[in-house]
Amino acid sequence: TNRNEYTGMFEGYNLIFLTAEGFSTYAIREDLTPTLYKLVNSGFVFNNYYVPLWQTSTSDGEYVNCTGLIPDGQFSMRKSASNNMAYTLPRFFSAEGVYCRAYHNNTLSYYDRYLSHPNLGYDFKAIKLGGLSEAEWGSQLFTVEHPKAWPASDYEMMQGTVGEYINDDRFHVYYMTVSGHMNYNFKGNQMSAWNKDAVADLDMTENARAYLACN
């Protein structure tokens, strides 16, 4: 195969991979989101791309991220649960003996992630059962401070999960976030409400300020 100066650069590294709900780089500001600002302005930045509005929204975008394939508009991620998903990041990491985890700060059952994500190669956990049996699936829950908040806090998700893997020598972790979920206002969006003061002085519409606040 073709090789260049980057070939093998990250061999042996650990990987934390995120799909960010409803996210746009418009939300990144050095003063309000310094960590995100650092992430997108250092290392490798890939900006020659476009993102269509997938018919099944979050699930199709997640399917593209996790598989590198184009969805067919019929809940491709859900359907992948019965397919042979041999060429995914967790499959490659697992081949090197790395334990692969996935987390989502909503329900286990939404979009049938409790079926699709283990089929990708992840040990998948969420904060709520979503109608699944506690006896069968209760071990797949992790704890956050405000599990009933909508949208739930990505920060609390990190607090509740990092301890499961951070001391491992090797790990691959995937996060499906939810903090940036619509609607963008200060009444129906808990994340926006919690961070309202941080954006109060911005000369923007309420929707724009609420969007920045929840991200």
Please place each PLM-identified region on the residue numbering.
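Solvent-exposed soluble domains appended to multi-pass membrane proteins
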Residues: 2-215
